[in-house]
Amino acid sequence: MPSPDPFGDLIAPFSRRGVDLGLERLQAALAELGHPERRFAAIQVAGTNGKGSISTMLHAIATAAGIRCGLYTSPHLLSWCERIRLPDGLIGVEPLREHLAGMPALALRHQLTPFELITAAAFVAFAEAGVELAVLEVGLGGRLDATTCHPQRPVIGFASVGLDHAEFLG
């Protein structure tokens, strides 16, 4: 039997039905957090199939080149911690709980979705870890995806693109 989700109490209150794409909520929340996303550059990877593999390879290449690199992917298999890789490995349960525990009022005020909340936590964790570059895997769409809130994305990669989410994305 799987262990209980150590983040359910912090993330479940923000779960909503349906897709709610947009950047305004997360941009406002990041401003309140002091814009942690401005403290590192990013590569954003979008697409239907293969973006997780491409993101992981780019992270490995940057790390091998001596760059302090972070990786943000979704979804996770077993733990929310799998989504955030710092230079020293996956973020731990306690550090992620600390980041999330400091955000409920902010998340309620800006009506963040769980994906936006965990993206904000990733940006804070990357900034605190001194990451120079983060590889950000798009969750859904690209243009209105939470990862697009990052202002310094000199490289945007595309994996193969399908029509599987056309009803949300047009």
PLM regions and their residue ranges:
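Charged, amphipathic alpha-helical linker segments immediately N-terminal to NTP-binding catalytic cores
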Residues: 1-17
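A conserved segment at the C-terminal end of the G1
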Residues: 41-45, 53-70
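ATP-dependent carboxylate-amine ligase catalytic core
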Residues: 6, 18, 23-38, 64-154, ...
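A short, structure-level motif marking secondary-structure boundaries and short turns
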Residues: 12, 42-44, 107-108
